């Protein structure tokens, strides 16, 4: 590995990383933990930019934030959803790299430092790392790469969360998060990856995901579940619309991601609704888009097994009987 920094401060003192923190209903203590986890990193004030986007919270935390650091950029806007809050942050981001952090989560210092070292010493467009619900982690010097985003997506299932990747802002161009959906990451992340020419991966668990009752991903009521499923389905169709405009290699990579999302959708319909009629309606729509039966590909053993099971009405009924409803 090179010992000379690649992305050091430029002549205009451009920050190395812009951290975009989105905040809505988290407690002040939790938000404080989030921001402190960024301040604890080995970045000087000129190397970091912290942007907190308040998406219409009942209480403004500006005084508490300024008590932590005077250079925090705080923006308050009417509630428009997570995607638009992130877009607001991107409009203000001046760093060479961008890191998204949800206000109820944290970066884990020792392992995130490994990610920072990659962008300091390698010509990376993106660093992929892992999340955890534990605060005690062990740093690993295991960076692998570089590989293009197209190649990575062709041979790997990817995680949709945009919070577990650190990316160079220049690869964004005009890409932004969709508005008004619960699955903005799933639509944004694969498109961003295809734009990356050099991806480094690490097994460092650098992002702490705090499980919270009442959060978007843990709502219990049926209406909310149905909306989640409908949004996920529309994301698949929007990604599919752009496939024909991609070069051959990028198209193959995106088709794998679409197949993965289609499998996830079918699985979630089964476990979140346990409703055969609802499942059949979803499968009919996927079929109309040429997405069901699932493509006959050797992506993973789990994918091949699930494809065989869902290809027959008997297999689908068996899944409905055996897969437990998510509680």
What annotation goes with each model-predicted range?
Residues 98:
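Short aromatic/hydrophobic "clamp" motif used to bind/position activated sugar donors
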Residues 15-18, 37, 49, 187:
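Cell-envelope/extracellular polymer assembly enzymes that use nucleotide-activated donors
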Residues 206-213, 219-249, 268, 273-292:
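Catalytic core of nucleotide-sugar-dependent glycosyltransferases
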Residues 35-78:
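Acidic donor-binding segment of Leloir-type glycosyltransferases
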Residues 1-4, 271-327:
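Membrane-interface aromatic/basic loop that binds lipid-linked glycans or pyrophosphate carriers
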Residues 22, 82, 102-200, 210-226:
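Donor-binding/catalytic cores of nucleotide-activated saccharide
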